[in-house]
């Protein structure tokens, strides 16, 4: 459980630092990895890729309930739980602190919908954590 909390804290801290750095550098845009990854900052006030037009205060209890339900279902231990918890709390913190999330990662050469969306490290940590939890559960 301590490892899970440490991973979650590391994700939360890293995501906060990246946001701070992007805002200090005036939301610069640039390509990385030969154009396979693009830094393209975009403020997101909604949720679920802006499919849910809810305010930060409306999203907070929903986010906490969803995190709690996922962790109760899949477990509170391990790397997957730490990544899921850290990613979820990072997005929640940004919504409460700033009223919106700063999405900044694009993958222009990815297939389908993946190339049209903009992500954060928090979202990637959340999705990777969820995938690890599902894989761990299937191995049992």
Stretches found by the model and what they are:
Residues 1-140:
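Alpha-helical transmembrane bundles and membrane-interface segments of multipass inner-membrane proteins
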């Amino acid at each position: 459980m301590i490892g899970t909390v440490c991973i979650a804290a590391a994700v939360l801290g890293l995501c906060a630092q990246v946001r701070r750095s992007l805002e200090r550098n005036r939301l610069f845009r640039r390509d990385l990895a030969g154009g396979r990854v693009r830094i393209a900052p975009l403020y997101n006030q909604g949720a679920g890729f802006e499919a849910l037009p809810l305010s930060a205060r409306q999203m907070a209890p929903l986010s906490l309930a969803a995190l709690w339900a996922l962790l109760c279902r899949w477990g509170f231990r391990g790397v997957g739980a730490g990544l899921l918890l850290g990613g979820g709390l990072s997005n929640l913190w940004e919504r409460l602190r700033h009223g919106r999330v700063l999405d900044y990662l694009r993958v222009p050469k990815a297939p389908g919908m993946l190339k049209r969306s903009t992500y954060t490290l928090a979202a990637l940590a959340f999705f990777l954590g969820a995938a690890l939890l599902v894989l761990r559960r299937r191995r049992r």
